[in-house]
Amino acid sequence: SSTETPPSYNQLNYNENLLRFFNSKPVTAPVPVELDPPKVESSYVSSAREDARSTLSPVQGFEGSGGSGSSGNFTTGSNLHMSSVTNTSNAGTGTSGTGNSGDGGGGGAGDGPGSGAVPPVTLTESLLNKHNDEMEKFMLKNDRESRGWSGEKNKKSANDTLKMVEYSGPGPGHGHGIKRGGSHSWEGEANKPKQQLTLNAGGMPPLVDIHASSSSLSKCQTSVAGGGGGGGAGSASGTCGTGNNGAGGGGGSNAQSSTNQYTQSGLSCTQNINLWPPFSVGITTPTSVLSTHMAVAQSSFSPQHSLFPTFYYIPASIAASSPASGTSPNPRPHKHTHVHPSSEQPSTSQGAAATMPLQYMTGVMYPHPSLFYTHPAAAAATAMV
């Protein structure tokens, strides 16, 4: 990024330093104090160098050494001064630089690029610092240009990405794409409360708010009017949503036929249960008890397509009707024992469990019939009533 500190000169010049160092074929062995050439060469070359050093002139001795170091006949001061230059220069140019520097005392002979006509420049600290400053400016300029080019490339790619996003945005042809869970849909259904059945700590489903389904209640009351009145109410509440055989005359037969159709058809029974309001069961009259049961039966024949999460279950008619028929064989007291406690206790969970069928989780289709059992609490409430 542009905010970071610029790299130092050593970092920028690292690769060039490595390349220049290995091109100079440096002497990696420890150099003795008298600056003799290293003894890693062959015996023939070393003996020839010793002979040349003892017999030849300084220039010729430098030629015989192959340009790999300064001559042994130089003074100690010149050797110390020129060691850095000769060790970092091109090592193979010693032979071409001979014969031109015999009068200079051998100082810097053979150090040039091969021409020998240009006099060697004496390296000083100020000259090296000046060279370093110039090279640092040059390297920083190259680094800035390279980073600027990469920054422009990144900016161009970012602009292309933004254009692609704009082109592929929600248009007339892109109305329905992949919708993730929890995202706002275009139909405005982002924050609607979900409606489903949840089991409480006792294993029973929450009590149903009867006043929330007024339309289904009105349908049920019209169907109950032709059914025979209070007799059907006794049979419906006593059998936990399945109906007794002929209990209460005409009303009982009506409830029996409707629940038998509901049991045989197995259609989806959807109930609009809101999770947010507190639980309230407003059972006041036997008519409301009957209409609550009939709402479950009638809603199966009038499917409500507006509610999406539906649940499928088969009521266990045998398990629910056996304890009720065992405790009250006479149908006439059977009617009275069910109508009055339900009206006397309008808000108890036992009465609601006795009048409401057991329901399971929404959106889940239970495939095996053994899963559809009557909860022990519901069976106990039915037996107690």
Curated annotation (Swiss-Prot):
Localization (cell): Nucleus; Cytoplasm, Perinuclear region
Coiled-coil intervals, chain numbering: none
Polar residues compositional bias, start-end: 340-351
Predominant place of localization: nucleus
Entry GO terms, CC: nucleus; perinuclear region of cytoplasm
Function: Essential for biological clock functions. Determines the period length of circadian and ultradian rhythms; an increase in PER dosage leads to shortened circadian rhythms and a decrease leads to lengthened circadian rhythms. Essential for the circadian rhythmicity of locomotor activity, eclosion behavior, and for the rhythmic component of the male courtship song that originates in the thoracic nervous system. The biological cycle depends on the rhythmic formation and nuclear localization of the TIM-PER complex. Light induces the degradation of TIM, which promotes elimination of PER.
Protein name per the record: Period circadian protein
Organism expressing this protein natively: Drosophila nebulosa
